[in-house]
Swiss-Prot record:
Domain of life (superkingdom): Bacteria
BP-aspect Gene Ontology terms: cytoplasmic translational termination
Protein name per UniProt: Ribosome-recycling factor
DNA repair as UniProt keyword: no
A GO term from the CC aspect: cytosol
InterPro entries, alphabetized: Ribosome_recyc_fac, Ribosome_recyc_fac_dom, RRF_sf
Keywords: Cytoplasm, Protein biosynthesis
UniProt xrefs under CDD domains: RRF
Disulfide bridges in this chain: none
The family this protein is said to belong to: Belongs to the RRF family.
Subcellular location field: Cytoplasm
Main subcellular location of this protein, as a coarse class: cytoplasm
Length: 185
């Protein structure tokens, strides 16, 4: 019973940290990274298809992404999808290869992005604390129904607090790496 609650809390906390990582990948740093275009979908035979299924995206250098399109007819559609995205990118095509130069980030924009990243991290911390609260509520319910002793309840709450501390440390580490990445010129 207690182990199930702890395992569930640990799994949910891990998912929260992973969700934060996925959220932060979408925030553009000064460096070219293929995952930057993961959120772009292209109209293909009447369905919105992820760009990575229609083309190969690689970082040509630190400031340029190269997109090799599998079907030449899709090149203009892919260019349009990139321009319509809110990433502020301006693709240039050369046959089946589309080059996407990344403009350098201004100091002000970097600071804005750091604020956004910190806000995302805080939302991650709140999610972790909510998971802890839910797990503790489940333990209290077991205690109230006399399914576990007060000692077991206390030990389990301590264990859940340790899981919470580890998850929050993971979030802090992810935040620190992303902030450093953003402020690097």
């Amino acid at each position: 019973m207690i182990n199930e609650i702890q395992n569930d809390a640990q799994e949910r906390m891990g998912k929260s940290v992973d969700a934060l990582k996925n959220q932060l990948v979408k925030i553009r740093t000064g460096r070219a990274h293929p995952s930057l275009l993961d959120t772009i979908y292209v109209e293909y035979y009447g369905a919105n298809t992820p760009l990575k299924q229609l083309a190969n995206v690689v970082a040509e250098d630190s400031r340029t992404l190269a997109i090799t399109v599998f079907d030449r007819e899709l090149t203009p559609k892919i260019e349009k999808a990139i321009m319509m995205s809110d990433l502020g990118l301006n693709p240039m095509s050369a046959g089946t290869v589309i080059r996407v130069p990344l403009p350098p980030l201004t100091e002000e924009r970097r600071r804005d992005l750091v604020k956004i990243v910190r806000k995302e991290a805080e939302q991650g911390r709140v999610a972790i604390r909510n998971i802890r609260r839910d797990a503790n509520a489940d333990l209290k319910a077991l205690l109230k129904d006399k399914e576990i002793s007060e000692d077991d309840d206390r030990r389990a709450q301590d264990e859940i607090q340790k899981l919470t501390d580890v998850a929050v440390k993971n979030i802090e580490a992810v935040l620190e790496v992303k902030e450093k990445e953003l402020m690097e010129v």
